[in-house]
Amino acid sequence: MLTLGLESSCDETSCALVENGKILANRIASQDIHAAYGGVIPELASRAHLQIFPKLLAAVAQDAEVSLEDVELISVANTPGLIGALSVGVNFAKGLASGLKKTLIGVNHVEAHLYAACLEEPSIRFPALGLAISGAHTSLFLMPNATTFLLIGKTRDDAIGETFDKVARFLGLPYPGGQKLEELAQDGDEEAYPFSRAKVSGNDFSFSGLKTAVLYALKGNNSSAKAPFPEVSETQKRNIAASFQKAAFMTIAQKLPDIVKAFSCESLIVGGGVANNRYFRRLLNQTCSLPTYFPSSQLCSDNAAMIAGLGERLFCNQTYVSKEVIPCARYQWESACLSH
């Protein structure tokens, strides 16, 4: 089955073609315009998606050397995300589906991030623990199989990617700051600042306290939002970045062993933009006793290959109930319960 995937949940526009689980073409266009504002401006993101989609669609068809007439299924990210951005993608997909007379399926963007690893490693054993880490999400899922996602835990405040961006801004790094903070931390002393990690009950996470601790480390007792940041040496910046990065990722890693045991998981799957962090990859490979799967770098970012792949799998497994595809900014997952 040849499947066209479309992704526009935030500030990346992407089109991809996947055939029977194999990626034929995958194009991603990032929107640099938001850097000047220090964050994503939803209206600008929507306009950019409108302009970019037609060009990307033509490009992936050329890359894969196929005609759009050959597409059998169109899969589009319709939740969760920025409502305007999602609407652009869904409406573009509906127009294509109507014009080409093809079947249309809506796919959950976060679930697709976890399915990305399955595209590259089809032999993952289930049940698996799925960890989605991005700018908007820090969530744990029980995955009885590759297409079922039951919520186990989530952040109670900031997502880890959002926290990275905020701390990067404290350190004077340009937006988006997550990768730049990782690079800064490489030459820092991760033991220089003993940032405490939030002890949240159950399987949830919290990062707001860690963010505040970094603010105090930089500003001292005068940590009000209006107070200017004092001059900090490059060595201090590197040490703060390294110490913060360790504390943030240990907040997650320290919880995983008990959760894995409680739900009898046989694998760990990690997805989302933050999954591309090399420090975190090494940390989990050192601390997790299970086979751990990360997508390749391109499939960590928002991309349409994961949307096409999950849509194709759902359709072929006949686990997708046909319904109108509607964009939705938020999504409420079913929770997993422990059986006693």
From Swiss-Prot:
Q: How is the cofactor bound?
A: Binds 1 Fe(2+) ion per subunit.
Q: Does the keyword tRNA processing feature in the UniProt annotation?
A: yes
Which cofactors must be present for this protein to function?
Answer: Fe(2+)
Taxonomic superkingdom:
Bacteria
Q: Which InterPro entries did the record assign?
A: ATPase_NBD, Gcp-like_dom, KAE1/TsaD, TsaD
* Protein location: Cytoplasm
Q: Does the keyword Metal-binding apply?
A: yes
Question: Which residues make up the binding site for substrate?
Answer: A132, I133, S134, G135, A136, D165, G178, N277
Q: EC number(s) of the enzyme?
A: 2.3.1.234
> What catalytic reaction does the record list?
L-threonylcarbamoyladenylate + adenosine(37) in tRNA = N(6)-L-threonylcarbamoyladenosine(37) in tRNA + AMP + H(+)
| Primary location class | cytoplasm
Q: What class of enzyme is it?
A: transferase
Instruction: List the GO biological process terms.
Output: tRNA threonylcarbamoyladenosine modification
Quote the cellular component terms of the Gene Ontology held in the record.
Answer: cytoplasm
Q: Keywords of this protein's UniProt record, alphabetized?
A: Acyltransferase, Cytoplasm, Iron, Metal-binding, Transferase, tRNA processing
Binding residues annotated for Fe cation, in chain numbering: H109, H113, D302
Cite the GO molecular-function annotations of the record. Answer: iron ion binding; N(6)-L-threonylcarbamoyladenine synthase activity
Q: Report the function annotation for this chain.
A: Required for the formation of a threonylcarbamoyl group on adenosine at position 37 (t(6)A37) in tRNAs that read codons beginning with adenine. Is involved in the transfer of the threonylcarbamoyl moiety of threonylcarbamoyl-AMP (TC-AMP) to the N6 group of A37, together with TsaE and TsaB. TsaD likely plays a direct catalytic role in this reaction.
Question: Which family does the record assign?
Answer: Belongs to the KAE1 / TsaD family.
Kindly give the PANTHER family that the UniProt entry links to this protein: TRNA N6-ADENOSINE THREONYLCARBAMOYLTRANSFERASE, TRNA N6-ADENOSINE THREONYLCARBAMOYLTRANSFERASE, MITOCHONDRIAL
Q: HAMAP family given for it? A: TsaD
NCBIfam families reported for this sequence: gcp_kae1, T6A_TsaD_YgjD
**Protein name per Swiss-Prot or TrEMBL:** tRNA N6-adenosine threonylcarbamoyltransferase
Protein species of origin: Chlamydia muridarum (strain MoPn / Nigg)
Gene that this polypeptide is encoded by: tsaD
